[in-house]
Each structure stands twice: as C-alpha cells, then as structure tokens.
C-alpha cells in the first residue's frame, strides 16, 4: 500500500519528464545551493515526502566550490557564480521553475529557474558564470 501511495504522490513529477518543454510552476525558492542549483518548496508532495526539491539548471556547468573545486580559481569562480544566483533570486519578484526531467543524481530535478520571466540559464552564460554543458566531458575551470 505504501508503494502505491508513493507512486501516486510522484505522478505529478513523473509526468513532466515526458514533456520535452517541461512544466512551469510558480515557486518559493528556499535557498541557493550553488550557481546552478536552487531549492524550492514542493508543498504539493504528500507526507512523508520532503516538502523541498532541488532543481539543477539544465544545459549549464558552473564552477564547483568547496571540496569539489579542483583549484583555488575554480573555488573563487564557484563562489562568484553562487553569489550571482543568490543576488538574481533576491532581486526577482516572480520566481518559477521549469521542470524537465529527473537528474542523474537522486533527489534533484533538471530544468530552469525563471526569474521575472528571464532564464537563469541564460543569465549565467551571458554573464560568464557558466558554460553550456549537455553531459560531455567538462572543461576545466582551473586556467
């Protein structure tokens, strides 16, 4: 019975994976994890499922920070990308997520964050905080 309830609970999320264009939701962003990942309230999920999901911005690679950074330059760039995303979220009034698919790492979804009608993906690339990335070998941020 629990398995059936969990499956039913996840049906709204599973359905967006079939739509290549994604499904757009108005959200409350709860925190910025790094330059390309934000957490948002997912209050539509029933108990005992978590009420927060993380969305990783699809199609970009931002520098890592902390222990994942491969050099001091990447750490600094990763922190700058995170700060950029935090500032963009803080300045925005209308916050949405475009959910596209499940991420290859459990617990996250892929999509985009739309701030006042503007794609975070586009903002990160245009301002030099991210590179386009679709699963190929990543370029180093250490040069």
Predicted regions and their residues:
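Sec-dependent N-terminal signal peptides
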Residues: 4-13
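Small beta-barrel nucleic-acid-binding modules, primarily SNase/OB-fold domains
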Residues: 15-143
């Amino acid at each position: 019975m629990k398995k059936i309830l969990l499956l039913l609970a996840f049906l709204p999320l599973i359905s967006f994976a079939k739509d290549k264009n994604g499904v757009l939701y108005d959200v409350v962003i709860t925190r910025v994890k790094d330059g390309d990942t934000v957490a948002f309230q997912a209050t539509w999920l029933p108990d005992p499922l978590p009420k927060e999901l993380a969305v990783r911005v699809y199609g970009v690679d931002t520098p890592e920070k902390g222990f994942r950074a491969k050099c001091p330059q990447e750490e600094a760039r990763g922190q700058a990308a995170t700060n950029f995303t935090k500032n963009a979220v803080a300045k925005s009034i209308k916050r949405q997520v475009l959910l596209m698919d499940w991420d290859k790492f459990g617990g996250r979804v892929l999509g985009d964050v739309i701030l006042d009608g503007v794609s975070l993906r586009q903002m990160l690339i245009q301002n030099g905080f991210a590179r386009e990335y679709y699963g190929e070998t990543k370029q180093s941020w250490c040069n």
